[in-house]
Amino acid sequence: MSSLNKLAIDQLNLAGKRVLIRVDFNVPLKDGKITNNQRIAAAVPTIQHALSNGAKSVVLMSHLGRPDGRRQDKYTLKPVAEELKALLKKDVLFLDDCVGSEVEAACADPAPGSVILLENLRYHLEEEGKGVDASGAKVKADSAAVKKFRESLTKLGDIYVNDAFGTAHRAHSSMVGVEHSQRASGFLLKNELSYFSKALDNPARPFLAILGGAKVADKIQLIKNLLDKVNEMIIGGGMAYTFLKVAQGVKIGNSLYDEEGAKIVNELLEAAKAKGVQIHLPVDFVIADKFAEDATSKTVTAEEGVPDGHMGLDVGPESSKIFAAAIQRAKTIVWNGPAGVFEFDKFATGTKSLMDEVVKATAAGAITIIGGGDTATAAKKYNTEDKVSHVSTGGGASLELLEGKVLPGVDALSPAQ
């Protein structure tokens, strides 16, 4: 899948060039203050590389929140400019817009070594192509206006760099509409592509997928694509109950059941069998009398089933042993979705046990990739982000890659030289 082999910033001659970088500064804000600067800090190596390799200017563009195509002050990137200034230890010029004649003039011939941050891209309808007006009505962008918006962005630099993996699955103007002859990945995006290509193009085997999450229907495309690639697959989380009920007639009580997904369970299991993929389902569960931290809990086997009025919220200790054995065999592991409701400590043991085993496997030389979203949150909770090979920064984007889809923001980049 050489579609992931793209031109990267370290293959470019940046001397004297204005470098336009699409970053992901979509940071959490509370009362106008940044509560977690991780996304800003993560972009610093790409910015520093451009500056230390003689770039005339670095122009940064990002979205923040969902202003839906109109200016809303609570979504301003102004606080990001201050944070960036502190991290780079140099001045950052913040512009009040991201396109238009004034912005173009400010970016045309800036002082050498300038860092410029543009205002929120999504203040303009033309970034996403659609939005919501002040009255709450849905509106679509006019194609001529989109073209003009993209042309204005293109004028702000000589070279385009994309370092926003979290938005790579969106065909937004800043992701696909900048018309420079050289369009490269920054270090964050390059790192994401390199790890996913290790898993999806040429994995060391056995290759294991660990899948969790609530609905089978949401993961059908993911399961189908991975069945063509993996040797073993663990199915945990809420969707395991639908599999067990359909395939083995297990009583699941009030556990999550996905009517839509249930229709395809047998087809997926037959496909796994035909392809020689070993599927591991839970054999026991930790059940609760309600969905709450203070629920009364106990462990039951799949044979016993979940009694009515109870729901399974985690996998049990025997399941964890079976899963651990599969992890110990694997040389490549992709994990997308927790084993249980790890947000409640009482029902976190299954996910924590998987995490411990994945960390051990990494130390023993396996390539281990945690897809974004809830599993990345679990890695943060258990402080294991630096103890696995890679934690993806993009929930939706990583899911679409694993589903076998082409990401528009990646597709728009120049091929590697």
Curated annotation (Swiss-Prot):
Annotated compartments: Cytoplasm
Pathway: Carbohydrate degradation; glycolysis; pyruvate from D-glyceraldehyde 3-phosphate: step 2/5
Top-level taxon in the UniProt lineage: Eukaryota
Primary localization: cytoplasm
InterPro entries, per database record: Phosphoglycerate_kinase (IPR001576), Phosphoglycerate_kinase_CS (IPR015911), Phosphoglycerate_kinase_N (IPR015824), Phosphoglycerate_kinase_sf (IPR036043)
Binding-site residues for AMP, renumbered to this chain: 214-215, 219, 238, 312, 343
KW Magnesium (keyword) present: yes
Entry EC number(s): 2.7.2.3
Binding site for Mg(2+): 214, 217-218, 374
HAMAP family linked to this entry: Phosphoglyc_kinase
Family stated for the protein in its record: Belongs to the phosphoglycerate kinase family.
Protein name listed in UniProt: Probable phosphoglycerate kinase
Organism, as annotated: Caenorhabditis elegans
Gene assigned in the entry: pgk-1
